[in-house]
């Protein structure tokens, strides 16, 4: 087994390598003067079980091309099996046609990764579970809920006062999975999105007065949904609001927006390498998925079941 990484999340890749007790593979990913991406594998991989860790986060297209070119390089270097480990799968929010004459970009990206020569995909908290079916190869979609649950139990001494909140109807399944971990109540924020990047909170379904609310979602981008949801929960009597989000996209002015919000804390994973601005934010904290991803890689390499990681 050999683990390699592109440029999108070297910090996570190094942490995963430490968990696996193996060195990170030697590969050069650089650009020519015209910005074309060039990859050179600097060690023998013939007959090896190769894992490439690369989130397709901002700049999404550059990191996607890095991944595709790395897959091609390993295929042409006679690797026995190639697994793409994609903690954050870009284009996942384009999983269906929202209107006429529009693409299903998530399916296109899945096709590109498959055609490049990968044998298996390992990812985390896909925005829509059906994206697994976009791949014609084995695909494991891990869940960050176990990592979040451990953090919640360490943070809150009185779990009986915790309510898990889904910021919209679509995230109820994810929120329920966390709530079951410590037998917490569930609430839902019913909102209406007026235009892209903005949301209007309408009402709260569930009892939140006097409770510590945990907002659970897969992606935080502009931060508007979270901030509006926090305002609505506090207006309905919540004692505090903390958000647990898997993928911290945090584009534009999101960090400043969240820093100035009523959120007690935003907890994100390192599926996307955090910027210095994120690390310096007073109410944003990063928890690591390195052990989860490392264990999944180890079990995949040894042909063991990964199903227990979903529990």
Curated annotation (Swiss-Prot):
Mg(2+) 2 binds at residue 168. Mg(2+) 1 binds at residue 127. It holds the Pfam family Pribosyltran_N. One of its GO terms (molecular function) is kinase activity. It comes from the Bacteria. It catalyses: D-ribose 5-phosphate + ATP = 5-phospho-alpha-D-ribose 1-diphosphate + AMP + H(+). D-ribose 5-phosphate binds at residues 193, 217, 221-225. The active site is at 191. One of its GO terms (biological process) is ribonucleoside monophosphate biosynthetic process. It is found in: Cytoplasm. Keywords: ATP-binding, Cytoplasm, Kinase, Magnesium, Metal-binding, Nucleotide biosynthesis, Nucleotide-binding, Transferase. GO terms for cellular component: cytoplasm; ribose phosphate diphosphokinase complex. Its cofactor is Mg(2+). ATP binds at residues 34-36, 93-94. Pathway: Metabolic intermediate biosynthesis; 5-phospho-alpha-D-ribose 1-diphosphate biosynthesis; 5-phospho-alpha-D-ribose 1-diphosphate from D-ribose 5-phosphate (route I): step 1/1. Its main location: cytoplasm. Involved in the biosynthesis of the central metabolite phospho-alpha-D-ribosyl-1-pyrophosphate (PRPP) via the transfer of pyrophosphoryl group from ATP to 1-hydroxyl of ribose-5-phosphate (Rib-5-P). PANTHER family: RIBOSE-PHOSPHATE DIPHOSPHOKINASE FAMILY MEMBER (PTHR10210), RIBOSE-PHOSPHATE PYROPHOSPHOKINASE 1, CHLOROPLASTIC (PTHR10210:SF41). Belongs to the ribose-phosphate pyrophosphokinase family. Class I subfamily. Homohexamer. This is Ribose-phosphate pyrophosphokinase. It comes from Mesorhizobium japonicum (strain LMG 29417 / CECT 9101 / MAFF 303099). The lineage of its organism: Bacteria, Pseudomonadati, Pseudomonadota, Alphaproteobacteria, Hyphomicrobiales.
